[in-house]
Amino acid sequence: MELESSPPLPPHVMLVSFPGQGHVNPLLRLGKLLASKGLLITFVTTESWGKKMRISNKIQDRVLKPVGKGYLRYDFFDDGLPEDDEASRTNLTILRPHLELVGKREIKNLVKRYKEVTKQPVTCLINNPFVSWVCDVAEDLQIPCAVLWVQSCACLAAYYYYHHNLVDFPTKTEPEIDVQISGMPLLKHDEIPSFIHPSSPHSALREVIIDQIKRLHKTFSIFIDTFNSLEKDIIDHMSTLSLPGVIRPLGPLYKMAKTVAYDVVKVNISEPTDPCMEWLDSQPVSSVVYISFGTVAYLKQEQIDEIAYGVLNADVTFLWVIRQQELGFNKEKHVLPEEVKGKGKIVEWCSQEKVLSHPSVACFVTHCGWNSTMEAVSSGVPTVCFPQWGDQVTDAVYMIDVWKTGVRLSRGEAEERLVPREEVAERLREVTKGEKAIELKKNALKWKEEAEAAVARGGSSDRNLEKFVEKLGAKPVGKVQNGSHNHVLAGSIKSF
């Protein structure tokens, strides 16, 4: 008599994130997507960040929750810092090496526990760039690994070319060298990711990103929050520099995540009640200028004043996000001039995805961070580009010169100038009225259609996700227990 065998356990993928909302959010979205395709996902970050997630998500540690065809759970490790030492947790120079020292040990222990105690061995590790040492852990344990790159493919190429000395970059003696990379437009010296420039004061950020570039050869997949048609030339070029298929565009990631029916992940941990949507409903179509500079970029109050008076002079209605400062940088909260306040709505937070998809929004004044860039492009919203540093200056080049969905207001903090109100008003008029505004909107709507096609069933991003899941050997599964069991893992490391 033949014994009845248990259904195979789905491949177990462990996602390890740097603690921080801008890092956790995209990786959680990826985890949700992978779970929906039939994988067992364990999302891991530090205990200090776990406390915040428990409050917002009401999650239970190590408890499996069904998502689509698979499962998602959370696990956390102690970062080894005193509970009240927030100063170290917000200082990258201190936190990064400490987290690597502690994290390597803790992640190895977690992998061991899942293998020996719950009989759910980890088949793949995925990290985001600020914890690139996860690739070393995977190599030590002989587990395949992948990375989620949360900037553009163009920025990935710039860092890759810089690290491997493939073309000339600005130096201390020649700071104004322009950079030409195959598959990309010529980048002026102030259009490359600014951390690469020798004059950048952010050398610690350059080092942490280069640490991931150094480890790319250890990964079998590089997920990128972009889509094929948006960056086709550079995606094709970068794919020739690595193993075939290693570059996997999965974007727009926030739109991909919406394709999953059952959402157990409240991505924004600080999300209050959204005060914006009812107000937007009361505004005419294409009448509101949305203004937000992200969670990290900080403008001087004098610049905020000039932007505010520029909005007033352009005679446009605005929705402006003025955030409470949460980063421990002792920055004062921005204040808008009294005479401006009656022209629009000021909020501390809003759901940017929902705002950008609202028909009342005419344009987006943005710092050009990649999340904001992707959300604007894939929502069909023209932009007024006010980049500051890092990848933002390169993202602005693409919106203005390549995709032709934006106009320029600044070249970044290296420009060292106060953009006057007259210039602000001129750019706002350009993007909201007249022939240029019509052309920008037409281009933006084209990219919105391309983004929707990419995430649709059978679209380029959907296919890239399916190929990865197939690579892991996912099979239809039965119920997975939270405790130990005798299931045999489907798939094999040898397939990688």
Curated annotation (Swiss-Prot):
InterPro entries this protein is in?
Answer: UDP_glucos_trans, UDP_glycos_trans_CS
Binding residues for an anthocyanidin? H23, G390
Residues that bind UDP-alpha-D-glucose: Q352, H367, W370, N371, S372, E375, D391, Q392
Report the outcome of G369E. In brt1-7; reduces sinapoylmalate content in leaves
Reactions listed under catalytic activity:
(E)-sinapate + UDP-alpha-D-glucose = 1-O-(trans-sinapoyl)-beta-D-glucose + UDP
The phenotype of cells or organisms lacking this gene is: No visible phenotype under normal growth condition, but reduced epidermal fluorescence due to reduced content of sinapoylmalate and hyper-fluorescence of trichomes due to accumulation of sinapic acid-derived polyketide.
Concerning what turns on (or off) its expression, the entry says: Induced by the auxin indole-3-butyric acid (IBA).
State the SUPFAM superfamilies in the record.
UDP-Glycosyltransferase/glycogen phosphorylase
- EC identifiers of the protein: 2.4.1.120
User: What are the entry keywords?
Assistant: Detoxification, Glycosyltransferase, Transferase
What PROSITE patterns is this protein classified in? UDPGT
Q: Name one GO biological process term.
A: cinnamic acid ester metabolic process
Entry keyword annotation includes Transferase: yes
Functional description taken from the UniProt entry: Sinapate glucosyltransferase (SGT) required for the biosynthesis of the glucose ester sinapoylglucose and subsequently sinapoylmalate and sinapoylcholine. Is the major SGT activity in plant. Plays an important role in sinapoylation of anthocyanins. Sinapoylglucose produced by UGT84A2 is a significant source of sinapoyl moieties for anthocyanins. Indole-3-butyric acid (IBA)-specific glucosyltransferase that catalyzes the glucosylation of the auxin IBA, but not indole-3-acetic acid (IAA).
Family in the record: Belongs to the UDP-glycosyltransferase family.
Q: What else is known?
A: Ectopic expression of UGT84A2 causes delay in flowering increase of indole-3-butyric acid (IBA) level, down-regulation of the auxin-response factors ARF6 and ARF8, and down-regulation of the flowering-related genes FT, SOC1, AP1, and LFY.
Q: What is this protein called?
A: UDP-glycosyltransferase 84A2
The source organism is: Arabidopsis thaliana
